[in-house]
From Swiss-Prot:
The keyword Transferase applies. One of its GO terms (molecular function) is DNA binding. The gene is rpoZ. Belongs to the RNA polymerase subunit omega family. This is DNA-directed RNA polymerase subunit omega. Signal peptide: none annotated. One of its GO terms (biological process) is DNA-templated transcription. The RNAP catalytic core consists of 2 alpha, 1 beta, 1 beta' and 1 omega subunit. When a sigma factor is associated with the core the holoenzyme is formed, which can initiate transcription. Transmembrane segments: none annotated. Promotes RNA polymerase assembly. Latches the N- and C-terminal regions of the beta' subunit thereby facilitating its interaction with the beta and alpha subunits. It is an enzyme of class 2 (transferase).
Length: 117
């Protein structure tokens, strides 16, 4: 195939606009270092992408899926911390009560509770 045109690929991807989108996506993949599935033959990336589609070394369906995935973004929603949530809702922060019981006092209280004094 000396010259690749859109006509050579229309039987693989009937919609010309979709074909252009898929070929452009594949050309960007090639530019970013993706491995070629055919010989370059001194052609530029868009021509190589069209040749890959025409020779069906890249399926239109897999290109379509990769193109869709590349356009999808996931936005993380920051959830407020529990302490901040309580304050936002107008209630007090649920924290343990501060006590001044030392370890020794705690052990004595436990021993007394068990009756081993």
């Amino acid at each position: 195939m000396a010259r690749v045109t859109v006509e050579d690929c229309v039987d693989k991807v009937p919609n010309r606009f979709e074909l252009v989108m898929l070929a452009a996506h594949r050309a960007r993949e090639i530019a970013s270092g993706s491995a070629l599935t055919i010989d370059r033959d001194n052609d530029k990336n868009p021509v190589v992408a069209l040749r890959e589609i025409a020779e069906e070394t890249q399926s239109a369906e897999s290109l379509r899926e990769r193109m869709i995935e590349s356009h999808q973004t996931q936005i993380e929603v920051d959830e407020p911390e529990e302490d901040q949530m309580a304050l936002l809702m107008g209630s007090e922060v649920d924290r343990p009560v501060q006590d001044d019981m030392s370890e020794e006092k705690l052990l004595r209280a436990l021993m007394e509770a068990q009756g081993q004094n």
